Amino acid sequence: MKRMVFDVPATASGALTVLEEYYKRAVKSANTGVQWTFVISTPEMEETENVRVLRYPWVKKSWLHRLFFDCFVAPQLVRKQNPDEILSLENVTIPFVRKFKQVLYVHQSLPFVEYKFGFKENMLYWTYQNIIGRFIIRSIRKADEIIVQTNWMKEACCQKAKVSPSKIRVEPPELNIEVKKYFTLEASSLRTFFYPASPNSHKNHRIILEACKKLKELGIDDYRVVLTLNGHENEYALELYEKAQRDGLPIEFIGSLKREEVYEWYSKSVLIFPSYIETFGLPLLEAKLHKAPIIASDTLFSHEILDDYENVWFFEPFDAD
């Protein structure tokens, strides 16, 4: 069997994690008779006996390069390789190749969440919800099979795209964690709040700063908040950093961490997770496995992961009180 995997957008964060999971799965399947071809952009992946890697780094130069690749190069590659199955990890199917079976992995949640972005508020997110989202929904209808990470995404896809639940299967992210140290109940750990998140507005760091400012006005400052930002990643991060410094808030910007370093923080802090747009919310599961206390946004994705967990408190992600 020949399986062709497309994921040229993936370069970092959750998208890259999904790609790496399938690559590892392909390498481990060397004795199953399945030949894999991965079509990617910039990630470095080694070829093996049953895995071939086709890299197209120029795809990342601009949206026009990506559009050209999607409309012309990708269909041509499919016809040339003649696979038994296409697996698209790009949230949309490969166009103009109807005779080939297509499995679509949908992990972009923006078109399906309740919160709607205004054009002036965030032009990119508005575009995903109102333009790219239409292509995602159309692809869900066209694909032979759909894979999502959570039950709430399955229900949302069924509702938005009007497809049968039998067409969609749920595959939670594989999380092979060797927990070396569980959360330790100490005064310092209960006063330390940790938020591992990228510098994007939907991660909702701002609500943390608002809450810290309110606590300062009440004379409460015997705690610390640790963010995995350095304050210089983009305008959003710089705005957060300058506000925290200006208001004298007990917030530390420690920069990005390796995965093992993140796990170490789970053992000595409370996870605070105010993000209101996620497909899965991986830190929630990671902290749960480390038995850490969690303060999470009151959202569908949070409840799906944490409703069976005792050490969690939910809050309204737009209310600093």
Model-predicted segments: where are they?
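Conserved donor-binding/catalytic core segment of Leloir-type glycosyltransferases
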Residues: 186-203, 209-212, 226
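Conserved acidic donor-binding segment of nucleotide-sugar-dependent glycosyltransferases
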Residues: 312-320
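Glycosyltransferase donor-sugar binding loop
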Residues: 41-43, 224-238, 253-255
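Donor nucleotide-sugar binding/catalytic pocket of nucleotide-sugar-dependent glycosyltransferases
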Residues: 141-159, 163-180
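A conserved mid-protein helix/loop that constitutes part of the nucleotide-sugar donor-binding site
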Residues: 16-24, 200-216, 235-238
